[in-house]
Swiss-Prot record:
Keywords: Methylation, Ribonucleoprotein, Ribosomal protein, RNA-binding, rRNA-binding
Keyword Acyltransferase attributed: no
Any Pfam family hit: Ribosomal_L11
Cytoplasm keyword on record: no
A GO term, aspect molecular function: large ribosomal subunit rRNA binding
GO annotation terms (biological process): translation
HAMAP family xref list: Ribosomal_uL11
Highest taxon of source: Bacteria
Protein name, entry field: Large ribosomal subunit protein uL11
Species in which this protein is naturally found: Opitutus terrae (strain DSM 11246 / JCM 15787 / PB90-1)
CC annotations in GO: cytosolic large ribosomal subunit
Its job: Forms part of the ribosomal stalk which helps the ribosome interact with GTP-bound translation factors.
Amino acid sequence: MAKKIQGYIRLQLPAGAANPAPPVGPALGAQGVNIMAFCKDFNARTKDQNGMILPVVITVYTDKSFTFILKSPPASVLLKKAANIATGSGKPNQDRVGKVTKKQCAEIWKLKKADMNAKDEAAGIKTIAGTARQMGIEVVD
């Protein structure tokens, strides 16, 4: 018999650096989940991706057990890393803060394609390029 689901928790956490401090502690504590068990499991599974922000979906069951699914890093984080910038532009249509190539957009799409709803590679690359433009990053050939 399958376990009954109590709820879902969605968080974005730095890989290998989950700790009981907010936002993890309050979100998991409200559902009655063992916070330290989650932190240890998460840090063990993400130690090779250190420094990246990873979305995680935690499924909490009525017996207070949990499972979690790791997603690929947000496109904005990958684009900032590719363009070697700390933040996007405050005025993306006026100020350009960095450059990425279409080849870099294709590499980001390959990392993100499991989590994206683009029909094919060309549409996925256009989506990533659109995200870059909205951040003030110029897309060059």
